[in-house]
């Protein structure tokens, strides 16, 4: 009887092991959120808005139209846009990387605003800010597109 129990236990163990070996590869463990078309589109729209603002300021440097006090509405609008994108991203599980990237966009906006308050003296001062924003936007969009393709990240 003991021998039969031992044989049954071994057979059961091997059967369970075989089932697990076959089942585990079929279980796709996800470490990041899925692609989100709304985030993709919102970030693209935000990039266009920021780029449009930078182009406008470049043209107006040295005029009253370029003064910070005449452009505070832009900063308010972009803060609302970033907040809306961030809330959506936070509502999705395993989306921490996108949230970190959005935090960098927010820091870039904070830096732009501080520099704008000090005043721009030449259009060349805008280019490093543009590069920082575009690097952040590109990172977010590349990450979303990689999710869309289902790449291992």
Each language-model region and where it sits:
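C-terminal motif of bacterial Sec signal peptides marking the signal peptidase cleavage site
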Residues: 22-26
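Alpha-helical segments in soluble extracytoplasmic regions
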Residues: 53-94
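Structured, soluble extracytoplasmic/luminal domains of envelope-associated proteins
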Residues: 87-116
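Short, charged, amphipathic alpha-helical segments
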Residues: 65-76, 98-103, 124-131
